[in-house]
């Protein structure tokens, strides 16, 4: 079902972003601040909380695995219910609120295990909100402009997240001398700053979002909940019968595993190699700055060569990146090379996967289908991070 009062007017693919598209994009700027902090600062802080014989790569890998598993189990069920008119924004708000509150809670004086538990909850909040946010793409723009809008989301998310991140890093390194604060206190303050940024850049979406495509009205919510499991089985059957869709899902499962594992484990892996925290931070900033134009460029190239062609090109590039990381990543120089290579392709492959999927699914069942999208994506994340964590635990060597 489609709400005719909220359908977007036809906009040429080459036209500038509309107000509705910009307000959708800006949430990527907000949540990406937490993503970047999770990649650079939080693993280093968590390592400082662990006992001397603790293994941060293993612990971090298991934390990522647990968070991914919870999301993979929850999202298809909640996604089916969220297709009811008006429910998508409520579920989004619930997960977003969980992420922000637990991001603030990480500033509490916790030992390493409770800290990881709170971090897992924050990650669940983030990833849960992103599932509903991704499905909002179909409400924010048209099929013809999805590649462009999705790419701008990732691109501006990469560059926008560097603003609070640079401020937090300056506070962590300069705060002890400027304010007579400890490094630990400055790090905890960075969690609060990130949460505030996240909230500030979510407000435009919360105040303007209108669900264009939906499956049922409010008075049908009870029956929608009761029939969720049978509907999920039916949806899975439809996916299996839709050859382009299930072929994409299988391919997505395998290639996104590499993408998610490299992103989530890069800092802890670099720290285990002995790369100091300053170099890790600068390398990740370089990744963000490289990813900004490359993600937007990928959206433009998709308009010229086609989305599938550009996804294939990014997959081939990522295969080379993973091969490089597995066999050549032994020092700071190789880590810098990895940072630049990842920045060139990660935004494009994520953005175009999101938009391509949005174009081939039924719009009035978008949340349900994006729930299955998350099953494949998060299960892939579970496999990658679990393998890294287990291998490190068994061998005692991250490399």
Task: Enumerate the language-model features and the residues they cover.
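Helix-loop boundary and gating motifs at the non-cytosolic
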Residues: 11-68, 244-283
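Intracellular juxtamembrane helix-capping segments at the cytosolic ends
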Residues: 128-142, 348-362
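Hydrophobic core of transmembrane alpha-helices in multi-pass small-molecule transporters
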Residues: 102, 113-129, 334-348
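Glycine-rich segments within core transmembrane alpha-helices of 12-TM secondary carriers
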Residues: 150-172, 374-384
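Helix-to-loop junctions at the C-terminal end of transmembrane segments
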Residues: 73-87, 293-307, 392
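Juxtamembrane intracellular "pre-TM" segments in multi-pass secondary transporters
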Residues: 3-21, 209-249
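A membrane-interface helix-boundary motif in multi-pass transporters
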Residues: 172-196, 390-399
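Structural signature of the two symmetry-related core transmembrane helices
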Residues: 90-105, 309-324
């Amino acid at each position: 079902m489609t709400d005719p009062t909220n359908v977007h007017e036809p906009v040429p693919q080459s036209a500038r972003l509309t107000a509705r598209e910009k307000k959708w994009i800006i949430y990527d700027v907000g949540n990406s601040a937490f993503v970047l902090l999770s990649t650079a600062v939080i693993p280093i802080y968590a390592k400082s909380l662990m006992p001397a014989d603790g293994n941060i790569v293993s612990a971090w890998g298991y934390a990522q695995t647990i968070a991914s598993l919870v999301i993979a189990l929850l999202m298809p069920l909640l996604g089916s219910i969220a297709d009811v008119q008006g429910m998508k924004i409520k579920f989004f708000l619930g997960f977003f609120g969980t992420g922000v509150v637990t991001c603030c809670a990480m500033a509490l004086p916790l030992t390493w295990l409770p800290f990881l538990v709170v971090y897992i909850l924050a990650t669940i909040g983030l990833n849960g909100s992103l599932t509903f946010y991704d499905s909002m793409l179909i409400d924010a723009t048209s099929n013809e402009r999805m590649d462009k809008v999705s790419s701008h989301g990732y691109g501006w998310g990469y560059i926008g997240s560097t603003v609070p991140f640079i401020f937090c890093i300056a506070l962590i390194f300069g705060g002890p001398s400027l304010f007579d604060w400890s490094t630990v206190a400055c790090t905890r303050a960075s969690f609060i700053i990130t949460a505030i940024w996240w909230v500030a850049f979510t407000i435009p979406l919360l105040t303007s979002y209108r669900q264009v495509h939906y499956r049922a009205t409010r008075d049908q919510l009870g029956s929608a909940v009761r029939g969720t499991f049978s509907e999920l089985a039916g949806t899975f059957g439809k996916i299996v019968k839709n050859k382009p869709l299930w072929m994409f899902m299988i391919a997505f499962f395998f290639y996104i595993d590499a993408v998610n594992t490299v992103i989530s484990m890069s800092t802890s892996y670099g720290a285990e190699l002995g790369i100091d925290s300053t170099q890790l931070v600068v390398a990740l900033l370089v990744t963000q700055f490289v990813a900004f134009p490359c993600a937007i460029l990928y959206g433009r190239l998709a308009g010229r060569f086609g989305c599938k062609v550009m996804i294939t090109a990014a997959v081939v590039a990522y295969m080379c990146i993973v091969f490089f990381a597995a066999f050549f990543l032994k020092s700071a120089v190789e880590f810098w090379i990895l940072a630049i290579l990842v920045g060139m392709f990660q935004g494009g492959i994520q953005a175009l996967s999101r938009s391509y999927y949005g174009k081939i699914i039924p719009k009035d069942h978008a949340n349900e289908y994006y729930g299955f999208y998350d099953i494949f994506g998060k299960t892939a994340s579970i496999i990658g991070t679990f393998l890294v964590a287990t291998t490190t635990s068994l061998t005692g060597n991250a490399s």
